[in-house]
Amino acid sequence: MLYKVLSKRGVPIRLTDERWAHITEEHCELAGLRLDILETVANPSRILAGYKDELLAVREINPGKHLVVVYREMASDGFIVTAFLTTRSKSLDRREQVWPK
């Protein structure tokens, strides 16, 4: 099954079955959070610059715990690369904030 949401820039971002399998195999704690992952891309608290043109959508899901969704945008399409949970807000704070400016 293919899921899509719009990024803050209005670009459709895909979550494919293959990427979902990767996310849940590497980060089993995210198995029940597919909708949270999509919601984080659509409505992040902030977007950070990643590596090689990746973007990191970040949303706090519990006090001190952030859901980070790594995705790529092309001109009219995009896709989710991976996602993970972190409590390391200081490492996130070191990245360039893309949105909001």
Where are the regions that the model predicts?
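Ribonuclease/tRNase effector modules and their secretory precursors
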Residues: 1-101
